[in-house]
């Protein structure tokens, strides 16, 4: 239903900013030094906007086709939630339920239009987490898995900076190390460090490029964003209470299961 109605949904403020920047990539060629209404727009990494612009380039420049990459990422997120659950020794039946819950969660669907950067940051991070388990299960450094994890970590960084590292990746590492026995802790640590180093290189080049090409504007925006995170972006703990009900209809059986 979401896929069929993507073209008629109202555009949110954050989504409009993404679409304007994507449109200016196509019309003005501002792929690296991103802009919004002709003004520098460096507050957000460009990967989700690139994907929206590429989709519009190959199909049509409208809201529907610029939303398609986010819709595809929802499907990928559900698929990898299923695969991750199954890899963690959970039955196929329960893993399918996990994937279905992801696909039908109100919050997952909502952030495609409410926060288009988030769905990509967390989607790519979930892929990185899935492949990182292959690192944990090898007693020696496996470069193939290290590279795959590093690439998807960098995609997450190019979608919304380090947010998903703090929200998903590092908590997952802590939980996994506590619960599961590792064949070789030293090898695992080195593999993760190599993946993080690769992610830093692949995910940080755009920031360095913009800083080099437009230093004054980049530093001014960075200073303003830093100030925002210490002022109006600070929320009281009860601000996040609504997250418990953002699974939509699945909040009801989840609540009943706790009784």
Predicted regions and their residues:
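Transmembrane signal-anchor helices characteristic of membrane glycosylation enzymes that use polyprenol
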Residues: 1-15, 197-209
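Extracytoplasmic catalytic/substrate-binding loops of multi-pass membrane glycan-assembly enzymes
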Residues: 6-23, 30-33, 39-51, 61-64, ...
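Transmembrane-lumen/periplasm boundary regions of multi-pass, lipid-linked membrane glycan transferases
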Residues: 21, 155, 159, 164-259
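Loop-to-helix entry region of an early transmembrane alpha helix in multi-pass inner-membrane enzymes
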Residues: 46, 50, 59-76, 111
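Transmembrane-helix motifs of polytopic, lipid-linked glycan transferases
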Residues: 68-89, 127
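Membrane-interface transmembrane helices that cradle and orient dolichyl/undecaprenyl
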Residues: 86-87, 128-146
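Membrane-interface alpha helices of multi-pass inner-membrane proteins
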Residues: 110, 145-160
